[in-house]
Amino acid sequence: MSVEDSFKPGTTQTGPKGQLAHPKTLEHSKRLKKKLYKVGDNAWSLIGNGLSNQSFVEGPEGLICIDTGESNQEMAAALKEVRKETQAPVVACIYTHFHYVGGTQTLVDENKNLAIWGHNGIQANL
């Protein structure tokens, strides 16, 4: 049975990248166009880069990344966007929850001494 056959007829549509989704999901995704927003002094949030948003805060010692996304490619794309605003070195990342950690290696490649912060139970989920 194909993926298409597992859905009730008429309940899915094919999206612009060939993905199958409910029509309301495809409509909602149009609102999530990839864009870096300045959300405060030295603070940015990238929306539409993947499942999670990646946020960045520039502190006195460098850039803190909040959530690293689903993959290294996603985090690399996020860094490329924020580098248009700041060249501060990446000094830390914060995990808000476990499935937003997939792009951490991209940050470690920039800083072998990267500080990583998350809640006490996050290690069990990695």
Regions found by a protein language model. Give the residues of each.
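Conserved structured core elements
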Residues: 26-27, 37, 76, 98
